[in-house]
Amino acid sequence: MAPGSRTSLLLAFGLLCLPWLQEGSAFPTIPLSRLFDNAMLRAHRLHQLAFDTYQEFEEAYIPKEQKYSFLQNPQTSLCFSESIPTPSNREETQQKSNLELLRISLLLIQSWLEPVQFLRSVFANSLVYGASDSNVYDLLKDLEEGIQTLMGRLEDGSPRTGQIFKQTYSKFDTNSHNDDALLKNYGLLYCFRKDMDKVETFLRIVQCRSVEGSCGF
């Protein structure tokens, strides 16, 4: 292979491995469309993992009558993310600016950086492909960085950084033989699935507004 071709391949490989390269680096500016594609891939993967793990756990451990009583009880089905002001319907969502939706998505992602560790035993026993606490954590961190990069690009061209959002989920007993622990883990999975759905939805809306030809995908 010619030296020039080898250099081009190495550069391309480096860009693929580092999707959130800072704008002021020696590398070419990454197209906005690609930044959104990278963010959407991670958001979709997180949402799918959350949905599949929740469904698997529910079918294995939660009787149908227990599920209905759990979901109908505001005390047990309350997610910590309820404290993060988020639009509750399509109309409210459409009224939010791109930066507002990205900011909300960032807070939702950051609110799960610690709680996913409480689900270590759930992920370890899951048959869902890629469901491990380390893999989920890495996806969350990657998406956190990606959203910060998008916020900077849409605002002033420089990556945004900030304090990690502090959550208040209490540590749960992960003893799988404890009924109370099962319900608490079920509650965490329920909230995780719900929040990842919001993140994917908000990012898709911002992508549609920002990148021509990206709506409907």
From Swiss-Prot:
It is found in: Secreted. The modification Phosphoserine is found at residue 132. Zn(2+) binds at residues 44, 200. Disulfide bonds join 79-191, 208-215. GO terms for molecular function: growth factor activity; growth hormone receptor binding; hormone activity; metal ion binding. GO terms for biological process: animal organ development; growth hormone receptor signaling pathway; positive regulation of receptor signaling pathway via JAK-STAT; response to nutrient levels. It comes from the Eukaryota. Keywords: Disulfide bond, Hormone, Metal-binding, Phosphoprotein, Secreted, Signal, Zinc. GO terms for cellular component: extracellular space. Belongs to the somatotropin/prolactin family. Plays an important role in growth control. Its major role in stimulating body growth is to stimulate the liver and other tissues to secrete IGF1. It stimulates both the differentiation and proliferation of myoblasts. It also stimulates amino acid uptake and protein synthesis in muscle and other tissues. This is Somatotropin. It comes from Pan troglodytes. The gene is GH1.
